[in-house]
Amino acid sequence: MQIKEHFGNPLIEQRNLFEGSSYCLMNQPGIISVSGEDRLSWLHSLLSQNLKNLAPGDSAEALLLDPQGHVEQMIKIIDDGQTSWLMVNLENSQMLLDWLTKMVFRMKVVVTNRTDEFSLVGSTKKNPEIAFLSNSQPLIWKDPWPGVAPGGYRYSTRKVNYDWFEHMVEAKKVEELLGNQALSGTMAADALRIAAGRPSAMGEVDEKSLPHELDLLATAVHLSKGCYRGQESVAKVHNLGHPPRRLTFLHLDGSEHSLPDVGDQVRVSGEEKIVGKITSTGQHFEMGPIALAVISRSVAEDVALEVLGSSGVIAATQEVIVPSDAGKVADIPKLPRLKLAGPKLGA
């Protein structure tokens, strides 16, 4: 069965997916299994999320950061009680596989590439009947967005309705399991994600991304755990500073009947200075043309924006995801200045 952007009517497919009456065969992820009795404590020590007590059948999101706290990998994790299953973007999977293999040392873990064995099927309703059973657990990843995982912190106050499940399905059984089901293309799934303000590794993450900029402290970071690469930077920005950029949702002017491209530049309306870029675009079945953009923190939250598209300038209005004042949550008291007493000169 082919992965398709749409099957002829993207907006109807999107509504069906939203209502839970269809499935989406997702772009192929890289899939890595980590088995062995040390797997959870080992992954816990390497990644941003608290994984030590992940129960069989539970899922989580975690980040692999560089030493400066920039996002290298967004990782979806399912544990079945014997094996942890990691899903990442296909183009990044070999890098993660190599790095995990290098970090094994004497830990009792086995790291294996399982990409060719599985496909990924998304829906807004969980269906254990189509998911692969491993150690009697259906392998289903539940997206924690827009909630707040234990130990997380959400900057956004935006209210969204978003339930999303990704089922690991045996690649050889996809046709059998989905052949008689209503299907939606990947454009439908992406539009629902954008409407929810949900960042993706393929769209929103670049080489400069900090978790704070994308509101990923809510779902992928446990702020009370340490000892993982990049942890000091995460804590410093969250407690004492502000992320330099912020994720925002955009309502686009649809009068030109065209969407901007990913990477198109964004500026404040009426000004020349570039303040950010488009990271994801879609046509929503209710809201019309929408996008996500990463822009400078200094851009006012209520100012109108313009997107410099290939077919012309597109007007855009913001709906705040990460606010301008995100970060600096530590309440550090200011010490009173000490007045030095002593004789005045010339007295």
What are these regions (language model features)?
Residues 217-221, 231, 235-347:
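Glycine-rich, small/acidic residue-mixed loop/short-helix segments
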Residues 44-52, 98-106, 239, 271, ...:
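Short, intrinsically disordered, mixed-charge
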Residues 10-19, 60-74, 104-107, 145-155, ...:
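Short amphipathic beta-strand starts and helix->beta connectors
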Residues 160, 166-251:
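Anionic-ligand-binding alpha/beta catalytic cores of soluble enzymes and soluble regulatory domains
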Residues 22-24, 30-31, 76-199:
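Acidic, low-complexity central loop/insert segments
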Residues 1-61, 65, 69-72, 346-347:
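Acidic, proline/glycine-enriched N-terminal capping motif
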Residues 36, 86, 124, 230, ...:
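Residue-level signal for inorganic ion chemistry
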Residues 119-139, 196-208, 327-347:
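Short, low-order "capping/linker" segments at domain edges
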